[in-house]
């Protein structure tokens, strides 16, 4: 699963290079109905707390019904800082016998300004519970950009060297210097 996530992030890095006018990534995180309800509600509550869409840009057509009392969730998620609150979330989710889904975990650590628009039920995809998000490319942590964009550029240069040897001869070391 983690290798697949790396491929996903490398793909987003490629999009950023191939489509430099792209400012936002709009997508979703998926959890399935079998996932622990209380853990799901706690994750949703955490996402609202730290990534709420205050402008109400998007709303789900068929929103998730949060079944866990807000008072309970507030008693668990007591920190104002993301990192400290995340530790509390992770501990409680594990206590409930599950882990935070890897994709959800990855998105939460991608950008401090991610917007979460709420979760909804996708009736056309096995009743999957999908949470809509928006990430500004400019706000993605530099370490994440470097890791996934650099790999794309290196792969692109390797491809050019192999596919167009005459171009490489004409460019000489300049092509290598472009990615060094």
What are these regions (language model features)?
Residues 152-180:
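Short, cationic low-complexity segments
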Residues 33, 48-49, 139-141, 154, ...:
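Short, intrinsically disordered/low-complexity patches at protein termini
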């Amino acid at each position: 699963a983690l290798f697949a996530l790396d491929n996903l992030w490398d793909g987003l890095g490629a999009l950023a290079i191939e489509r430099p006018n792209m400012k936002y990534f709009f997508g979703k995180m998926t959890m399935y109905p079998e996932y622990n309800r209380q853990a799901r509600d706690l994750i949703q509550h955490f996402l609202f707390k730290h990534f709420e869409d205050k402008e109400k840009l998007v709303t789900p057509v068929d929103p998730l019904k949060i079944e866990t009392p807000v008072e309970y969730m507030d008693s668990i998620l007591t920190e104002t800082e993301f990192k400290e609150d995340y530790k509390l979330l992770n501990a409680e989710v594990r206590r409930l016998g599950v882990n935070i889904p890897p994709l959800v975990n990855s998105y939460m650590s991608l950008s401090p300004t991610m917007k979460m628009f709420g979760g909804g039920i996708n009736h056309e995809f096995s009743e999957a519970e999908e949470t809509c998000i928006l990430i500004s490319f400019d706000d993605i942590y530099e370490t994440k950009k470097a890791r996934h964009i650099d790999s794309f550029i290196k792969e692109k240069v390797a491809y050019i060297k192999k596919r167009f040897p005459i171009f490489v001869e004409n460019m000489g070391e300049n092509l290598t210097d472009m990615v060094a």
